[in-house]
Amino acid sequence: MAVVGAGQAGLPIGYFLKQQGCHFLILERARQIAPAWRERWDSLTLFTSRRYSALPGAPFPGDPDGYPTRAEVIAYLERHAETFELPIEFDSEVRKVELNEDGRFRLELSGGRTVAAVQVVVATGPFQTPYAPKLAEKLSTGVFQTHAVGYRRPDDVPQGTVLLVGGGNTGFQIAKELSASHKVVLSIGSRQKSLPQRLLGRDLFWWLTKARILDKNVDSRFGRKLSTRDTLIGSSPGEMTKRFRVELKPRLVEAAERRVRFENGSESEVDAVIWATGYRSDYSWIKLPIFDEAGRLRHRRGVTEMPGLYFLGLTWQYTRGSALIGFIKGDAEFIAEKIAAHEKSKAREAERTPVDAGAYAGLHSEEGAN
């Protein structure tokens, strides 16, 4: 079987597949582990402590109550893959997935190679295609622009007024960092509930775990309600204005040259814009009938309607923790068990039905593959 992606979703499913004794290969488009983490800004610090940032099988090293940096996360993921000897093939971008006539999945890889697999896990995670609104095209070419994925450090941003568009955790964190060296305007489209990173001396996720809030899933009324709300962790609008002197603005509605206008009619002139406006899923490479009329994936806890095809690491795939590095293990173990059961079922079917040698295999290189 094949796993697409060697990041915070691909590694835990790999761990559990090894526990199940499954034969599999992890296909990674980049040349290194966890490319999505390498694309984040240098000073990024997780809002989950090390205690709640570990993958299955290995605790996150260091002070369990401290908060790991981007560099620490990357090093940890690399060690995890090495420790459990996960079979990863780098420089192997999956460009198409379709169904073969024999019922197996056919994966077209970069370089013209193909792989056939009885089962496939898409573990590309929630950070796929950076999104910026059409307004970006109306700004002058003299205005520095980048999506948050392209931001690394304050020195890369021209001096002057910087507009951060996006009121999520990313927008707030980057605004804080830039406020020490730039004039920062933060445009917030919709207000989010602010939660402290620590409460009564305990990490927020200690409380959420104790209250079993992170166990609430999309099948429950409370879980469905939570899934429609985003939360700010460790930041608040009041803190931004008072401590960091960031100017808060409502939704951005218009742009022309260097001028931008907000929903309340106020305007600003900007020298740089950072779009912290999130990501969009891109599954155009999956040529299978698993999407609804609006293009949304149809699944139940990552299990699609097509036998043998699974997804892992989606936002609210099942719970609030489904896309968080330290809480993805529940979904990963669930899917690994489904995969093992499916594999055993196929093996029993093959025993009952005479087939040509090699017709059933967990993973098979077709013509053009190594």
What are these regions (language model features)?
Residues M1-A30, A34-A36, D65-N370:
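Flavin (primarily FAD) cofactor-binding/catalytic cores of flavoenzymes
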Residues F47-D65, D215-N217:
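Glycine-rich flavin
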Residues W37-W41, T48, R198:
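Short, flexible helix/strand-to-coil boundary loops that buttress conserved ligand/catalytic motifs
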Residues Q32, W41-L44:
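Aromatic-lined carbohydrate-binding/catalytic grooves of carbohydrate-active enzymes
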